[in-house]
Structures are given as C-alpha cells and as structure tokens.
Amino acid sequence: MSAIQNLQPFDPFADASKGDDLLPAGTEDYIHIRIQQRNGRKTLTTVQGIADDYDKKKLVKAFKKKFACNGTVIEHPEYGEVIQLQGDQRKNICQFLVEIGLAKDDQLKVHGF
C-alpha cells in the first residue's frame, strides 16, 4: 500500500518567500501587464517581470513599431526595470509576447479595469 505524500499542513497566509516546496515550479516568473490611468482618458500600460536575459530597449523598440505608440524603460525601486507604453496595449502585448515565444499564455498576468 502506498503512502499519501500530500498530508503536510498548508498555511495560505504564510510568506511565499520562505522557500517551501509547496508551490509549483515557475510561479515566480510571471509577466505582469498593468494599466494605469493618467489625466483624462489617457492611460499607461506597464510590463514588469521580463527576464534580464532580454534587452528591454530592443523590446520597447519592437513594441513602438508594432503598436504605433510611444514607450520607454523606467527603473522602479521595487520591481526593477519596467516597460511603459502609452495607451491601452494589454491585449497587443499579450499576443505579441506569445507570438514571438517570449512567454506562454499561462505566464501572463493582466491587471486593470
């Protein structure tokens, strides 16, 4: 008779940074795509969590050319390098990142309205 392996207690409010092996692999490498309201109807789209292996300035250049918007890379004190784009580009960024193979669909987290 085989022993059941998952009989450990699980605390959902515990710190995720303790290094417990209860979380599945790959949960920390999400790419977060957020939208921020500016003045009036203007919005900013931010992309955070792209690996350091990729040149973010080249990605911004490709985004600007593909989506016909302005963009830049800013240094955020908490999140590191973050890509900022003008306008609501959430769907476009998701499709583009999956299309070029930089991220899978389940690695993208879209936040906003």
Swiss-Prot record:
It comes from Gallus gallus (Chicken). Gene3D superfamilies: SUI1-like domain. PROSITE patterns: SUI1. Keywords: Acetylation, Cytoplasm, Initiation factor, Phosphoprotein, Protein biosynthesis. One of its GO terms (cellular component) is eukaryotic 43S preinitiation complex. It is found in: Cytoplasm. This is Eukaryotic translation initiation factor 1. InterPro entries: SUI1 (IPR001950), SUI1_dom_sf (IPR036877), SUI1_euk (IPR005874). The record marks R41, K65 as: Binds 40S ribosomal subunit. Component of the 43S pre-initiation complex (43S PIC), which binds to the mRNA cap-proximal region, scans mRNA 5'-untranslated region, and locates the initiation codon. Together with eIF1A (EIF1AX), EIF1 facilitates scanning and is essential for start codon recognition on the basis of AUG nucleotide context and location relative to the 5'-cap. Belongs to the SUI1 family. The keyword Secreted does not apply.
